[in-house]
Design a protein with these regions (language model features):
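Residue-level signature of transmembrane alpha-helical entry/exit and packing/kink sites
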Residues: 7-11, 34, 50, 70-74, ...
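Interfacial aromatic-anchored transmembrane helix boundaries in multi-pass membrane proteins
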Residues: 20-31, 55-87
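Hydrophobic transmembrane alpha-helices
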Residues: 1-39
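Juxtamembrane/disordered regions of integral membrane proteins
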Residues: 13-19, 56-60, 65-66, 89, ...
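Central hydrophobic cores of alpha-helical transmembrane segments
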Residues: 14, 50-61, 95-103
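Generic transmembrane alpha-helix motif of multi-pass integral membrane proteins
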Residues: 33-50, 80-85
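Membrane-embedded alpha-helical hairpins and interfacial helices in multi-pass inner-membrane proteins
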Residues: 92-166
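Membrane-interface helix-boundary motifs at transmembrane edges
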Residues: 2-5, 44-46, 85-95, 158-161
């Protein structure tokens, strides 16, 4: 039980650090939001932890960053991506790309629903088209931050296991 608690704390620490990275200046859409959802879904063994801990951390960081009209869709995407990766349970480039695509589709559908481009099929297509440059940054960020989270966690977890065994 102690090792499980240590693992939950270590995962939470990684999520807090990733959320803090949202507070530093960054290029548009180069943030660890999707990576946080991917990591928490893949690493927590309890779905309640996988959803609640990172959502609480995200809410706290959003208090400092600010909430936007699109926030509901961002959180919806976050929940869906977390569940997707909870079911997958591993880090693969395909899972990261699929998660990036899910975030892109859901968040930009939200932009369209909130009236950003007119309520027509052409407006929806324009919305997605205008978002493509941001999607490129998002994919790069998702690959970058996911890699750091997963490989950093693997090293830290090995270190934690060796420390607790001694």
């Amino acid at each position: 039980m102690k090792n499980l608690n240590n693992r939950v704390l270590l995962i939470t620490l990684f999520l807090v650090i990733a959320a803090l990275l949202r507070l530093i200046p960054h290029p548009p859409n180069f943030v660890p939001i999707t990576a946080i959802a991917i990591f928490s879904g893949a690493k927590f063994t309890n779905i309640k932890y996988a959803l609640s801990i990172p959502l609480i951390i995200m809410l706290i960081s959003d208090v400092f960053i600010g909430f936007y009209t699109i926030s509901l869709f961002v959180y919806l995407a976050f929940i869906i991506i977390t569940i997707y990766n909870f079911l997958r349970k591993k880090y693969t480039i395909i899972n990261v790309f699929a998660s990036s695509l899910l975030f892109f589709m859901i968040s930009n559908l939200g932009v369209w629903i909130l009236g950003g481009y007119g309520y027509t099929f052409e407006g929806l297509l324009l919305c997605y088209t205008m978002a493509i440059p941001f999607f490129v940054n998002a994919i790069a960020a998702d690959m970058f931050y996911s890699t750091i989270l997963f490989f950093g966690f693997k090293k830290a977890e090995k270190r934690l296991i060796s420390v607790t065994k001694n």
